[in-house]
Amino acid sequence: EDGFQEAAAQAGGLAREARMTGPHGSQPTAARQGAVCAPMPAGKPSAELGEILQQVLQGLSRGEESGAAPRVAVLLDRPQPHLSNWLGPALGARELIVCSMRDEQDEQDGCPEAEPVEYSGLIGLARVVGFTNQVDLHQALATHGRFDVLVDALTHSPGMRATSAQLFIGIVRDGGYYVAIDGAALGESLNTAGLITRASRSLAGLHGAAGELSGDERSYGEQVAALTVLDGGVVLRKRGDGFVKLRYAETPPILSARYGESWGRSLETLPARVTPLEVIGVTNNPGLCAKRFPRENRIPETSVLEYRDVCVAPRQVLVKDHLLLPNTFRLATTKRLVNTALKELNHYYAAPRVDTQSAPRREGTFFYLDIEYNRHFGHFMTEVVPRLYAWKLARATHPDIRILTNSRADRGRPPAYQRILLEAYGIDDDLVEVITSPVKVDTLVCAMPLMQNGRFADPALASTCHRLRDGLLERSTPNDKPQRRLFISRKPDMWRECLNGSQVEECFARRGFTIIRPEGHSIVEQARMFYEADVVAGYIGSALYNIMFARRPIDVIGFINQSYLATNEYLICSVLGHRLHLFYGDEITDCRGKDCEGRDLGVTNRDYVFNIERDGDQLDELLDSLEETWGES
């Protein structure tokens, strides 16, 4: 992105081409009197450019859509209306989108924000959109859909030309063309060498050349069906379709620009805000805690969106045409959007692993609760529960709305614990509809979750937890002798195993803690036990998420290795007012490769040992203080 911004700054004094509509449907304004934005003088296209176009035209004539007028996009970082005017007719384009780089100071430099087509010298039905950086360009291309031909006439450095091709070939349809015009053909210096080198490396790697390819390099090579190097530039023929990854904030404007009001609507939007986080109590590694956990709770703008005419595929894949809607991504505010049910192409594009275009239609209006890891208790608690807040709004808006999810368990129904949790929240099981393959639906209500691992937790999540807890408690009776102190153990040989866990648990047992394994109890029984506890200790992981059901703010003691990155317990504690005391163990770097379920331990899930000799006294002091706080009950 920095390279795009640098190029925009260098072009600061240059005129922009007109924009008939902006990236999100903005309309042009009249040119100001006295503005001087003269375009480059038109010239006859060179033989080199003609050769490139001939290569593309021949390919289009042989394709599956031969005879159809192509949709063409042109990327420019300076005004070249003569080039755009020549490319459109030469390719027989039915639509020409000119993406023109602009500098943010252009208006102050005498160039109007949007100029009429006559002023810029463009002809025909060309539409011009401006961009200042890589993200702008991504959004502009997403706004205008897939293209048969994308012509890159940017005059960036060779490295940036290579990056542009690797990223934005994703917007070209299967069988289409990405054309990079060399700077020399435009009167500039040669600048496609990096593109040729990078594309060739990816292709060679797929055919057994020495050297390791990254995932993105491999995906790039798989998208290039043919690479042709000509005097005037480079032609890449595209293989496969890319789907655009969308983020929450950019989705409504992009959908509105593409579909008008027919895409759907926003049912609710809550403003972004920042709240303090004061969660950590005692720890044996304050430096790591300060580095690992956020000190501010940066809650993004939160929305409940109602989509129309979308396709839903199992494992949280949500598609409209060739757009991957933001509810596809469980970690939707991270730098890169990823879903393991998708084939990654690059930062901006991915592709479903199943056919979403010919999916059958499922009648009805639905509330979306599917998740990527649909049988995992921890993911359900941290990714479905934080979406339940919108159920009341969805039901008020659509009284006949149903739940849409997917499952591979319990004869096509969600796992029993999920059904019980939903019923406790007030969602009857007969309202839950399960899919096992892609379906298209007329209306789908999707809530952005109130919590995201590693990022934020909205305090509003507390009311959802309380409603869920109270619904579960109605299904059980109080214990005659409630256990006020719980230690949550784990099955042996799971990943992140505390190898001296028996010693740790013995220490807590001597202090009056009851050792339990939650999986041996129903979710209703678990809710009751956690509700009655004043202190909960155990190994960091999904079994501790039941602290959501506590009756009041409690003390939580967690043990974990030093590389584990998830922060769910921390965020849950922040919402409910719990105090988290965290003890890090010493990792075993040469440990086993897989756990008892066949999962790779990798770096973040290594086994560890709690160093009792070094940290035992600190733990004892904490337990002494908690006895004073909570008494001996």
Residue ranges and their predicted role:
Residues 176-182:
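Conserved beta-strand signature within the Rossmann-like core of class I S-adenosyl-L-methionine
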Residues 184-198:
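Conserved class I S-adenosyl-L-methionine
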